[in-house]
Amino acid sequence: MPVVNYTNHHNTVLAEFVASHSSPNSEIYDLCFSTFQGVLGQPGLDATENCFVLERAGVVKGVALVFREFAISRSVIEVMTDPEQSGSLDELELVQCAVARAEAEGLGVAHICVLPESGRGGLLEQVGFSQVRTYLDMLWDQDELPDLELPQGYSVRSFQSRDTPLLTRVQNDAFTGSWGFSPNTEEQIEYRTQMPNTSKSGILFLFEGDRPAGHCWTVMVPAENGVRGVIGMIGVVPEYRGKGVSRHILHAGMKYLRSTGLSEIGLEVDGNNEPAVGLYKSTGFKTMGERHWFERVLPGT
């Protein structure tokens, strides 16, 4: 059996595998390497139980991570393999090991996100998955930011060390009930603010007076031309929905990313979320591709 459970001796070689497959050039290798090591250490993952490694003759050929979201009875499985493993029996075994782990935890569904060109969707359908959502990859690369002034009484500021409870509350209030969102704990939020691909200056709050209206969480990811800034999350708390504040939150995140010297800004959005898609298109974002979410309902649910 080429699939084994993660052990601590895998840490460096596995991070090297992920970094070498994620970074198109050496400039951003270190970012990919350190970010994946951060992923392995995040609260609640327990990598020795929920990370599976595909090996051949001691060489890493793939990895699968099982993120358990007990609050919504869901597991999110992330899979990466060498290109030559695509559609192979070994890749199938890797996926099945991850699904079996989710089943053993009594979770209701397993979700896996794939790029259409990867061909992994067909493999997932062989083992009971079906496509349930399409997300759009969007990109903004214009020369000038949109000209937008904050409404009177509103202000923007970055995350500060005392803000973990505030960020946890705002994010959970903004997204609870949204497809695929599992409420976060303060421990999880604090850890993620310290990830290598995150800057606390790039986590932004929008306030009306002293009341939080929403937030934007930006991150850095590898891209063909180097590092790309990404609008990771834009959340509006329920009492501010329908007031047009999401455009100002988006603008704050874009302004921060451009201030760091990044020329490209990306984001992902649920294709079913027509208001959000419309906002991004009107701001100048263009659709560059898709990501397909597959779901398998697990036994006993």
Model-derived features: positions:
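C-terminal "cap" of GNAT-fold acetyltransferases
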Residues: 136-155, 263, 268-274, 289-301
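Flexible, substrate/cofactor-facing loop regions flanked by secondary structure
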Residues: 24, 32-36, 150-227
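Acyl-donor-binding surface of acyltransferase catalytic domains
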Residues: 68-71, 83-152, 294-296
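Conserved acetyl-CoA-binding loop-helix of GNAT-fold acetyltransferases
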Residues: 87-100, 233-236, 242-259, 277-282
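Conserved hydrophobic beta-strand within the GNAT/NAT acetyltransferase core sheet
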Residues: 110-114, 231, 265-269
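Conserved active-site alpha-helix within GNAT-family acetyltransferase domains
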Residues: 115-133, 243, 247, 271-289
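Conserved donor-binding loop and adjoining core beta-sheet/short helix segment
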Residues: 19-100, 208, 216-227
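A short beta-loop-alpha structural element at the N-terminal edge
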Residues: 1-16, 155-169
